[in-house]
Amino acid sequence: MSNKFLGTWKLVSSENFDDYMKALGVGLATRKLGNLAKPRVIISKKGDIITIRTESTFKNTEISFKLGQEFEETTADNRKAKSVVTLARGSLNQVQKWDGKETTIKRKLVDGKMVVECKMKDVVCTRIYEKV
């Protein structure tokens, strides 16, 4: 994994997040809170363990994992998912599976920004973060 991912990132733009949350099955009240949140994402690495911590006024979440190894996580909207994160062509690609459903979260670096593309079925959301 590129060390350029490491550090603290703040959300600067978000496109189609509400539709993505709807596709996930997130209820209206939680979607409203999610849309208002301006999360900070802290990515760190210790040995071969990567940690992604997301902090917002809505909720804090943290996942720690080894690339390519499945782990369990509880998402910000309280889904219990099995996830795997892999590295391909410079992107951190996360696949979450729960209740027969699947979503992908791709994190890539573009011009010094972290571009996060979330996809559920045919709904795509793009969130852009700048390093703090």
Curated annotation (Swiss-Prot):
Protein name (Swiss-Prot/TrEMBL): Myelin P2 protein
Locations listed in the record: Cytoplasm
Main location: cytoplasm
InterPro entries: Calycin (IPR012674), Fatty_acid-bd (IPR000463), ILBP (IPR031259), Lipocln_cytosolic_FA-bd_dom (IPR000566), Myelin_P2 (IPR031256)
Chain positions recorded as (9Z)-octadecenoate binding sites: R107, R127, I128, Y129
Native source organism of the sequence: Sus scrofa (Pig)
Free-text function comment from the UniProt entry: May play a role in lipid transport protein in Schwann cells. May bind cholesterol.
SUBUNIT field: Monomer.
Gene name linked to the record: PMP2
One Pfam family cited in the UniProt record for this chain: Lipocalin
GO terms under cellular component: cytoplasm; myelin sheath
Disulfide bonds: C118-C125
SUPFAM superfamilies linked: Lipocalins
Entry's free-text remark on domains: Forms a beta-barrel structure that accommodates hydrophobic ligands in its interior.
